[in-house]
Amino acid sequence: MARNDIRPIIKLKSTAGTGYTYVTRKNKRNNPDRISLKKYDPVVRKHVEFREER
């Protein structure tokens, strides 16, 4: 099995419209749907929701 089969690299994009992204990995087997996490956006200096971008 290749390294990226089960845990691919994904981008989390800010919903605040700043264009700020986080890069992380996710387990496709445990989380087949798109991820949304609350993380810090330094552009607006707030915690906002980040959604998975494909």
From Swiss-Prot:
Lineage, uppermost ranks: Bacteria, Bacillati, Actinomycetota, Actinomycetes, Mycobacteriales
Cellular component GO terms held in the UniProt record: cytosolic large ribosomal subunit
Record gene name: rpmG
Keyword entries, A-Z: Ribonucleoprotein, Ribosomal protein
Organism: Corynebacterium diphtheriae (strain ATCC 700971 / NCTC 13129 / Biotype gravis)
Record-level GO BP terms: translation
Descriptive protein name: Large ribosomal subunit protein bL33
Transmembrane segments: none
One Pfam family it belongs to: Ribosomal_L33
Molecular functions (GO terms): structural constituent of ribosome
Entry keyword Ribonucleoprotein: yes
Record-stated family: Belongs to the bacterial ribosomal protein bL33 family.
The UniProt record lists the keyword Metal-binding: no
PROSITE patterns noted in UniProt: RIBOSOMAL_L33 (PS00582)
